[in-house]
Amino acid sequence: MKLTCVLIVAVLILTACQFTAADDMEYPKWLRGLSTDXSERGCWLCLGPNACCRGSVCHDYCPR
């Protein structure tokens, strides 16, 4: 059981490191569709019609 937890944590850490490294590169096409403002980096999971990315922070409401 402990080994399973350690392996899961290791996979999560490696995945986070890959996303951090990929943040310096251009967004893949499938990630561009998740953010309403794909020009900002660091908001790869802004979802919903009112969500947007300003200053690399995801906001629930953005004035137009």
Swiss-Prot record:
Propeptide stretches in the record: 23-64
Signal peptide, first to last residue: 1-22
Modified residues (6'-bromotryptophan): 44
Compartments, as annotated in UniProt: Secreted
UniProt modified residues of type 4-hydroxyproline: 49
Principal cellular location given in the protein's record: secreted
Keywords assigned by UniProt, alphabetized: Bromination, Disulfide bond, Hydroxylation, Ion channel impairing toxin, Knottin, Neurotoxin, Secreted, Signal, Toxin
Tissue: Expressed by the venom duct.
Modification(s) after translation: Five different peptides have been sequenced after total venom examination by HPLC-MS. cal6.4a-4c are identical in length but are differentially hydroxylated and brominated.
GO molecular function: ion channel regulator activity; toxin activity
Highest taxon, organism lineage: Eukaryota
Transmembrane stretches, start-end: none
Gene Ontology CC, one term: extracellular region
Disulfide pattern: 43-53, 46-58, 52-62
Recorded domain comment: The presence of a 'disulfide through disulfide knot' structurally defines this protein as a knottin. The cysteine framework is VI/VII (C-C-CC-C-C).
Family classification: Belongs to the conotoxin O1 superfamily.
Described function: Probable neurotoxin with unknown target. Possibly targets ion channels.
Name this polypeptide is given: Conotoxin cal6.4a
